[in-house]
């Protein structure tokens, strides 16, 4: 467990050292999971390089043990860094934290208790991260809970955006163009990945159980949807298994498009 905690803390500390550097001309923001929508995972900065890497020291640590019922054991998240603030999903409840990038001070924390629905999630724990959106005035943090809810937060306060969805939340198991086996509480669908924000559209995929271990072929179809970033209104849906009359339906022989599932887009969309 110590190794997992240190991994999160060291990554944050290294970001903190870069943000604290006297050179402020370089863009050290990391505003999306992959740095940018192209998925480059690259920033052209040289404040940390081969000549000084061995001189880095831990500036601060932040432990996530108390954000959930037990310590995290499978850390996969990538924090975002925007204007000197670090945003990350954290803990077994998949809360969201905002930290001062220089000092590590906790600025705010947000989490939702999802009860049985969260416990039954096929994609539990802290997940791979979250997304950031701004129009130059408003700044929002967007993430998907273990129970498959899309949440919009004020980046400055961590409070839910009341005008988004229903009190800042969209139930992704609803308006999904299918009936979920197991219903809202135990229906097998979730998401580890961060939602992708393209312009003013939030793109959300779907995932089933990890490790190619579906209980049945007749399972949830992992459709992809786009939502308006301001209101949460569903803008479009892509059926990964085509419906009757749609392109590709006839290639699913013997009516298999009606019964087959497990076709999620679980990875990070770019």
Model regions and ranges:
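Bacterial N-terminal signal peptides
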Residues: 9-20
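Conserved hydrophobic/aromatic positions in well-ordered beta-strands
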Residues: 31, 46, 97, 151, ...
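Inter-blade boundary loops/turns of WD-repeat beta-propellers
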Residues: 50-53, 84, 101, 135, ...
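Sec/Tat signal peptide C-region and signal peptidase I cleavage site
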Residues: 21-25
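Repeat-blade elements of multi-bladed beta-propeller folds
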Residues: 30-34, 72-91, 95, 121-149, ...
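N-terminal secretory signal peptides that target proteins for export/translocation
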Residues: 1-6
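Aromatic (tryptophan-biased) beta-strands that constitute blades/sheets of beta-rich domains
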Residues: 26-70, 105-119, 159-184, 233-240, ...
């Amino acid at each position: 467990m110590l190794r997992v905690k240190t991994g999160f803390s060291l990554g944050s500390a290294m970001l903190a050292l870069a943000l604290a550097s006297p050179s402020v001309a370089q863009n050290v923001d990391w505003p999306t999971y992959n740095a940018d929508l192209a998925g480059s995972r690259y920033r052209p900065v040289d404040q940390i390089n081969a000549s000084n890497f061995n001189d880095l020291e831990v500036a601060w640590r932040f432990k996530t043990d108390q954000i959930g019922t037990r310590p995290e054991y499978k850390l996969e998240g990538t924090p975002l860094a925007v204007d000197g603030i670090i945003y990350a999903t954290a803990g077994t409840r998949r809360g969201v934290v905002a930290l001062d990038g220089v000092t590590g001070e906790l600025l705010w924390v947000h989490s939702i208790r999802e009860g049985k629905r969260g416990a039954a999630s096929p994609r539990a724990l802290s997940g791979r991260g979250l997304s950031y959106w701004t129009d130059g005035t408003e700044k929002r943090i967007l993430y998907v809970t273990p129970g498959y809810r899309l949440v919009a937060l004020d980046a400055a306060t961590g409070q839910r955006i009341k005008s988004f969805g229903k009190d800042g939340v969209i139930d992704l198991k609803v308006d999904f163009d299918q009936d979920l086996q197991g219903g809202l509480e135990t229906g097998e669908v979730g998401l580890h990945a961060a939602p992708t924000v393209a312009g003013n559209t939030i793109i959300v995929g779907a995932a089933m159980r990890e490790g190619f271990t579906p209980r049945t072929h007749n399972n949830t179809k992992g459709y992809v949807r786009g939502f308006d970033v301001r209101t949460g209104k569903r803008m479009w849906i892509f059926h990964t298994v085509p419906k009757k009359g749609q392109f590709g339906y006839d290639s699913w022989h013997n009516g298999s498009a009606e019964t087959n599932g497990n076709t999620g887009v679980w990875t990070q969309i770019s």
